[in-house]
Amino acid sequence: MITYFTPEKIDRIEDNEIFVFGSNANGNHYGGAARVAFDKFGAEWGVGEGLTGNAYAIPTLDKNMEKVTKLKLVRSFIKFIEFANENDSKKFYLTKVGCGIAGWTIEEVKEILWVAAKACFLECKLPSNIVIPEEFCFSNPELYKLELERGILIKRAKMAVTDEELEMIHNQILDNESSINILKGDLTE
């Protein structure tokens, strides 16, 4: 089953899943999603950025507990996106990074995320193994779901073993693209 958007509350994850949270540069995981990462997913005290346990820290506050600059947050998101892209066997659940204790708005973080995505891929897209909060969705959520499914189908096609399997996936991709085109048409009318 495909998980399209990060659940509001995450209590448990599988071994191949990573909880992505906002942290401070000191790696002091006192509250919010950082505390959840520390208590439940093995985030280490003192690690303010990167993979730590079954969690990934994105610093939204600096060492003085002030908001990081937008540029620093973009750079941290770029590092995260590149890391997720290089670790495509893992699924990353991005929480509403920075929108709690750090005080960033949903719109600010959403914009920063997609600027970082564009910097990585020269278009507004994320690797299909990154699950985002619905509020961070740049386009229509239904269109985003279909585009995510297309990315997963393309990955499966690359791993197909038999001609029959490849043909079945190819037909699913065509159906998916047809649905995307229909939805895009509905959005422009």
Language model segments and positions:
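Generic short amphipathic/hydrophobic targeting helices enriched at N-termini
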Residues: L148-R150, E165, I169, S178
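Amphipathic alpha-helical coiled-coil segments
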Residues: A157, L174-E189
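Charged, low-complexity interaction regions
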Residues: K155-M168
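Macrodomain-like recognition of ADP-ribose-binding/processing modules
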Residues: M1-L146, I152-L153, G185, E189
